[in-house]
Amino acid sequence: MSRLQFQLQATDGAARRGQLSFPCGTVQTPTFMPVGTYGAVKGVLPGQLCDLGAEIILGNTFHLFLRPGLEVIADHGGLHGFMRWNGPILTDSGGFQVFSLAHRRKISEQGVTFAAPTDGAQVFLGPEESMKIQKVLNSDVVMIFDECTPYPATEDVARDSMELSLRWAQRSRDAHDALDNDAALFGIIQGGVHPDLRGRSLDGLQAIGFDGYGIGGLAVGESESERNVILEYLHPRLPTDRPRYLMGVGRPEDLVESVARGVDMFDCVMPTRHARNGQYFTGFGTVKIRNACYARDVDPIEQGCGCPACVGGYTRAYLRHLDRCNEMLASMLGSLHNLWYYETLMANMRAAITAGTFFAFRRSFYLARGLDPPPLP
């Protein structure tokens, strides 16, 4: 039996408010998962993540397998002990990272052979290997091993990729069960931007049976409208008693629009990556701190923000100075701000769904940016 219990608590249109319960903690949904690629969210301590409102984080199976390796992580009793995070952890399967290697990989029915980016050594990864790795990591949510369909892709290419992922899904399920792993196992819906293929993928995954469903193969170059069409197609077809995870999609606008279309879980490197590039998220848009207009600006990043950077009184001028000097404190403070913004955005959406005011919240979100909300179906 899976260690995950999911409870759907409220809906407002397609937007869903729920709770994921694990032995190590509960997660309120919709939720945003900070990304700890190498076992750490860049520049942020685990205790700080908790203070910012994060309840679950993502670890990267592919990178942790290559470095430091499973033996080191096993010495710590798994990823929780290794990175000193006591809450739930979701690990991806490594499929997307293998996809990103492009010309350095070879895909077969059995799995993927690739040149490791660390030392060039030939490495094989398939469904069984991915499940074994994630068992050692001892994550609370395990993702199946799949092929991320490229974009653009013809319908024939997308179909072949989706069908391969379905065969790998069955092997992932079998391997996960054979390992007696009580972590939740999520399937991943593929099919490119072709709704009928997405539907076939979902049907096949439901026939196998999973604890939740990831929506993969998006945020790879498709337009926002193409993505929304897929989400709108899947929403009435997905089981209501299972969490839905949109993988790798992370602009604030994307989160709002995807919650409006029934998504429960998100992850993205954007908050910390943008902070390292001097871009800070606010309710009125993005502050690009490298612009000259901030050179003598004594305001915080955003008035009324509760993050350590803004509450601490660090001014835009100071942050710009740090950024221009390549001082690591700039990216640390920026990451704290951006993650606070994301977690607060999710908390505000949860409250609005519970109150039945999500679509009023959505309108105000766009109006604060001087924009009109995009149309909903």
From Swiss-Prot:
Cofactor note: Binds 1 zinc ion per subunit.
Pfam families: TGT
Residues the record lists as binding substrate: 92-96, 146, 190, 217
Region (RNA binding): 248-254, 272-276
CC cofactor: Zn(2+)
UniProt keyword annotation of Signal present: no
UniProt-listed InterPro entries: ArchSynthase1/Queuine_TRR, TGT, TGT-like_sf, tRNA_ribo_trans-like
GO cellular component, one term: cytosol
Catalytic residues, chain numbering: 92, 267
Protein known as: Queuine tRNA-ribosyltransferase
Species classification: Bacteria, Pseudomonadati, Pseudomonadota, Gammaproteobacteria, Lysobacterales
GO BP annotations listed: queuosine biosynthetic process; tRNA wobble guanine modification; tRNA-guanine transglycosylation
Assembly notes: Homodimer. Within each dimer, one monomer is responsible for RNA recognition and catalysis, while the other monomer binds to the replacement base PreQ1.
Record: residues binding Zn(2+): 305, 307, 310, 337
Pathway the protein takes part in: tRNA modification; tRNA-queuosine biosynthesis
Alphabetized SUPFAM superfamilies for the sequence: tRNA-guanine transglycosylase
Biological role stated in the UniProt entry: Catalyzes the base-exchange of a guanine (G) residue with the queuine precursor 7-aminomethyl-7-deazaguanine (PreQ1) at position 34 (anticodon wobble position) in tRNAs with GU(N) anticodons (tRNA-Asp, -Asn, -His and -Tyr). Catalysis occurs through a double-displacement mechanism. The nucleophile active site attacks the C1' of nucleotide 34 to detach the guanine base from the RNA, forming a covalent enzyme-RNA intermediate. The proton acceptor active site deprotonates the incoming PreQ1, allowing a nucleophilic attack on the C1' of the ribose to form the product.
